[in-house]
């Protein structure tokens, strides 16, 4: 603490022995030791209070951060989030609205099939494209966006080709 070496301690001891005297020296040393103990206790108490204040400040910061997160999370209440997700899913599932041309206001109601046999006889493969379909696709806002194209593949016999590849393979390689 004071960076005192052995030679300095010996010098202080000799001066104290001469100044105080051998008779009163043990009492003075005891009193100095008690003062040193009190000073150490006070320093430890101050350090403990300082650390406690730092912990309280950290806890206040953590509580403030927690309250901010809690407040932000309250905006995402279960009903609001689920309603938003359900709306997004229902919008994404409205493929029929994108596939059909715009209808007039008089034919906007969706009609249910008259009998259950009509619902069973609907084809699962799409109809062949008509020129109106291409016009509608070009007029759509997402005409330049990539599409996921799927098709039904029929099993065809494998024919060995000794000549140039067919047009289908050329198209597949080009894309």
Curated annotation (Swiss-Prot):
Q: Where is this region: Disordered?
A: 100-132, 155-175
Entry superkingdom: Bacteria
MF terms in GO:
protein transmembrane transporter activity
Q: Does the keyword Oxidoreductase apply?
A: no
Task: Tell me the Gene Ontology biological-process terms attached to this UniProt entry.
Answer: protein transport by the Tat complex
Q: What does this protein do?
A: Part of the twin-arginine translocation (Tat) system that transports large folded proteins containing a characteristic twin-arginine motif in their signal peptide across membranes. Together with TatC, TatB is part of a receptor directly interacting with Tat signal peptides. TatB may form an oligomeric binding site that transiently accommodates folded Tat precursor proteins before their translocation.
Task: Please give the name of this protein.
Answer: Sec-independent protein translocase protein TatB
- Source organism per UniProt: Bradyrhizobium diazoefficiens (strain JCM 10833 / BCRC 13528 / IAM 13628 / NBRC 14792 / USDA 110)
């Amino acid at each position: 603490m004071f960076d005192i070496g052995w030679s300095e301690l010996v010098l202080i001891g000799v001066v104290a022995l001469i100044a105080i005297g051998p008779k009163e020296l043990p009492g003075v040393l005891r009193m100095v030791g008690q003062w040193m103990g009190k000073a150490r206790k006070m320093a430890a108490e101050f350090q403990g209070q300082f650390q406690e204040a730092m912990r309280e400040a950290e806890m206040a910061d953590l509580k403030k951060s927690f309250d901010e997160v809690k407040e932000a999370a309250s905006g995402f209440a279960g009903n609001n989030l689920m309603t938003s997700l359900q709306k997004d899913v229902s919008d994404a599932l409205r493929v029929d609205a994108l596939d059909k041309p715009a209808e007039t206001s008089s034919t906007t109601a969706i009609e249910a099939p008259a009998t259950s046999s009509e619902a069973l006889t609907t084809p699962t493969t799409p109809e062949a494209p008509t020129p109106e379909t291409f016009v509608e696709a070009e007029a759509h806002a997402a005409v330049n966006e990539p599409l996921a194209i799927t098709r039904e593949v029929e099993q065809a016999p494998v024919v060995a080709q000794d000549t140039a590849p067919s047009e289908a393979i050329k198209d597949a390689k080009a894309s």
